[in-house]
A protein has these predicted regions:
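Nucleotide-activated chemistry modules centered on ATP-dependent adenylation/adenylyltransferase
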Residues: 2-251
Length: 251
């Protein structure tokens, strides 16, 4: 089955270039300070903390805070093998901007080969189970390897991103991975995220300029139209109430 979108992106995307009003700047500075304090306190009590950077705008905010503050938090990313070229371009810009070397985790090639040979290269369009199997081998299993031996991990998730995240706490226990989980941007708005990006000259994915607010693997991500939910472009052929890749699904 081939899945394409008939929706046309809007001709303007004001959310990614908000007006930096006095009140907005003050709110961002206050919330950024709260994030810094939260992570500093976490580092004081937990020895091994990792941050999973997906290169979303939210994750770039956290990358900037962690590296600016020189917090002892290790950064890693998941390279699924099917990311957009713009995401790979951002990886290179992040390394140059922050003078750092990214740690990448890849899927096990045997699993990918077996999946493709059995089901086909784009089988994730054929059923929800096949899509979840693809996410599991390309994201969930590499994440488990990345988190091995860690006491906690940090994510850039926000409560306002989706109905599946509406009650997202700042700190929780991750039952799936058996460690603490911090969501420091839980109460941030999209406007505040982008305000921080522009206030601190944070590099970001150029697909955001083309109306992609949420970016995952290239075949499973599309642009959205004005007024759509910000995660409408992810697995757009599925029920929006249950769309997650498996990284943040609670048992």
């Amino acid at each position: 089955m081939s899945v394409t979108s008939s929706l046309k992106p809007s001709t303007a995307n004001p959310a990614i270039h908000p007006e930096l009003t006095v009140s907005l700047v003050a709110s961002v500075e206050s919330k950024a300070a709260q994030v810094s304090r939260l992570l500093t306190e976490a580092c004081a009590t937990l020895k091994h903390i990792s941050f999973a950077n997906s290169f979303s705008a939210e994750d770039m905010v956290l990358t900037d805070i962690i590296l600016r503050k020189k917090l002892p938090i290790s950064l890693f990313s998941l390279d699924t093998g099917r990311l957009p070229v713009e995401t790979y371009d951002l990886m290179a810009r992040v390394e140059a901007h922050y003078q750092t070397k990214l740690t990448l985790y890849f899927p096990q090639h045997e699993s990918v080969e077996r999946y493709v040979q059995t089901h086909g290269i784009n089988a994730f369009y054929d059923s929800i189970n096949l899509r979840k199997d693809c996410c599991s081998m390309r994201k969930v299993e590499p994440l488990q390897r990345a988190l091995a031996g860690q006491d906690a991990w940090v994510t850039g998730m926000r409560a306002a991103q989706a109905s599946t995240r509406s009650s997202l706490p700042v700190r929780e226990f991750d039952e799936s991975n058996k460690l603490e989980k911090f969501n420091p941007l839980s109460d941030w708005t999209e406007q505040e995220v982008w305000a921080y990006v522009h206030m601190h000259d944070v590099p970001y994915n150029q697909l955001h300029e083309q109306f992609y607010p949420s970016i995952g693997c290239a075949p499973c991500t599309r642009a959205i139209a004005m007024g759509e939910d910000i995660r409408a472009g992810r697995w757009w052929w599925e029920d929006p109430l249950n769309k997650e890749c498996g990284l943040h699904v609670k048992k």
